[in-house]
Amino acid sequence: MAEVTAAQVKELRERTGAGMMDCKKALNEVGGNMDKAIDFLREKGLAAAAKKEGRIAAEGIVEAYIHGGGRIGVMLELNCETDFVANTDGFKQFARDIALQIAAAKPRYLAKADVPEEELEHEKNILRAQALNEGKPEKIVDKMVEGRISKFYKEVCLLEQEFVKDPDKTINDLVLEKTAKIGERIVIRRFTRYEMGEGIEKREEDFAAEVMKEMNR
């Protein structure tokens, strides 16, 4: 039987919202086959998110957040399946938390798949050159690059970022949790972040740090 890897467990958890131990057990039961593992979890009633993947989430809200005298602004579209859920305080607070995350952590993309291939290759080339300059053997450089590129994803992709209020969870973890708790499919559809004077040479001001302070009040 093929050994189940941590990466497989993580992927299954992201796709189903099931617990880590349940995901590991499912993969072991089916010899590491991802599709069969999803079916296994669904049969056991443990795949909260997988059941809702095919459902349409066309309701929701557009959350607008403006920080510190108009110096940072965020617009976020958060979708759910019904207007009833969209109007609940819990859903609105979740949208607020995600908007604050965007203001503080400066993601440029929603998911890994949204990063342009040219930018990804450029980043990999830089990381490869860094590893070689550090004197690392060429045969292990590519593995090192793959490891380090995950840090890049965490910096630029919202769903991969650690939640500022609880660094033990990623934003994707939060979406899965909220989906399981509410019982509806929850989707971060899109977002835009503005920072006053962005792209203009100016005195350094860490507006993002100010947002983080506000989140932790």
Curated annotation (Swiss-Prot):
Supply the Gene3D superfamilies for this chain.
1.10.286.20, DNA helicase RuvA subunit, C-terminal domain, Elongation factor Ts, dimerisation domain
Record-linked InterPro entries: EF-Ts_dimer_sf, Transl_elong_EFTs/EF1B, Transl_elong_EFTs/EF1B_dimer, Transl_elong_Ts_CS, UBA-like_sf
**Which UniProt keyword terms apply here?**
Cytoplasm, Elongation factor, Protein biosynthesis
Q: Which GO terms describe its molecular function?
A: translation elongation factor activity
Q: Which NCBIfam families match?
A: tsf
Q: Which family does it belong to?
A: Belongs to the EF-Ts family.
Function of the protein? Associates with the EF-Tu.GDP complex and induces the exchange of GDP to GTP. It remains bound to the aminoacyl-tRNA.EF-Tu.GTP complex up to the GTP hydrolysis stage on the ribosome.
What protein does this entry describe?
Elongation factor Ts
Q: Which organism is it from?
A: Desulfitobacterium hafniense (strain DSM 10664 / DCB-2)
Record gene name:
tsf
